[in-house]
């Protein structure tokens, strides 16, 4: 996967070097298409003997979050081990084991992630973890990660987002308690299959009850957003605007023919509808990662 650098003149690619049998993250020049640098090579990093599955830059592009030992869950979701790599010093440190969706804060000082259905924050300077939610439980409560329906129908996994000033995290909570269960045999490496049971609402059955929450990093407090005006609804996307105190949230009814775009106040959790879309048939949600906020919001 090609990733454009912020200088706009270069891009990075995860390559496999046949000669050294090594995975490496290479930097290329857009104008010449020639390689100009190699950021990291697995042949020089014993901790990455299992390879590199994916990587993400911090906002200043001085650090990399590198995933390996990935284990799939559903179509898009997976858990993985994660390493923090400092490009200038070439220092590599394993910081997280079998977690989901670790994401740098915009200021590059923290990493939010989900482990066993709860949200945590890793502080890079102090190398400490703090827990945001505590009620996560398999097949009951999910914080910050989508359930099967959202992953399959709305094509996203990470259900949390950092504010632009790195002071808040907005996240969706899924209560799957009343969703019917489905079991299936999984044939893996073992001699006999194992049975996996997960929440799977068929047409007309109960969906997860979703709620929207705002976490303040400094005060370590959480506010629940009042969405009581809606009934049997989805929250198919959340995204902080350019204003660090305004979260946008899309609210879609179950018939998927009525969509509200809300602005949520990051301090009071008050909401207002800034856009409504209706359709006699249904609202096409194939590509709804399409919000662009201007500089003045």
Question: Language-model segments: what does each one mean?
Answer:
Residues 44-52, 139-155, 230-235, 279-288:
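Short glycine-/Asp-/Thr-/Trp-enriched loop segments that recur within the blades
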Residues 18-21, 73-80, 113-114, 204-208, ...:
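Short, solvent-exposed loop/turn segments at conserved positions within beta-propeller repeat blades
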Residues 30-33, 86-90, 124-127, 216-220, ...:
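Short loop/turn segments that connect beta-strands within beta-propeller blades
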């Amino acid at each position: 996967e090609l990733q454009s650098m912020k200088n706009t003149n270069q891009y990075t690619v995860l390559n496999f070097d046949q000669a050294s049998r090594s995975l490496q993250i290479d930097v290329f020049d857009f104008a010449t298409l020639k390689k100009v640098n190699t950021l990291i090579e697995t042949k020089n990093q014993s901790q990455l003997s299992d390879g590199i599955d994916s990587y993400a830059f911090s906002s200043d592009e001085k650090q990399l979050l590198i995933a390996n030992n990935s284990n799939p869950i559903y179509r898009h979701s997976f858990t993985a081990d994660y390493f923090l790599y400092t490009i200038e010093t070439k220092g590599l440190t394993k910081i997280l084991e079998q977690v989901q969706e670790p994401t740098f804060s915009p200021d590059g000082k923290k990493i939010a992630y989900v482990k066993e259905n709860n949200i945590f924050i890793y502080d890079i300077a102090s190398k400490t973890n703090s827990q945001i939610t505590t009620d996560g439980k398999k097949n009951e409560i999910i914080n910050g990660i989508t359930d099967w329906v959202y992953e399959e129908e709305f094509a996203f996994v990470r259900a949390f987002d950092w504010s632009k000033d790195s002071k808040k995290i907005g996240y969706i909570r899924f209560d799957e308690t009343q969703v019917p269960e489905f079991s299936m045999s999984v044939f893996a490496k073992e001699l006999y299959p194992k049975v996996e049971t997960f929440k799977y609402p068929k047409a007309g059955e109960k969906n997860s009850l979703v709620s929207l929450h705002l976490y303040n990093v400094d005060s370590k407090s959480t506010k629940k957003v009042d969405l009581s005006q809606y009934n049997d609804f989805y929250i198919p996307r959340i995204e902080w605007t350019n204003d660090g105190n305004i979260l946008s949230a899309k609210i879609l009814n179950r018939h998927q023919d009525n969509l509200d775009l809300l602005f949520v106040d990051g301090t009071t959790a008050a909401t207002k509808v800034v856009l409504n879309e209706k359709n006699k048939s249904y609202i096409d949600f194939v590509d709804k990662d399409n919000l662009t906020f201007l500089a003045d919001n």
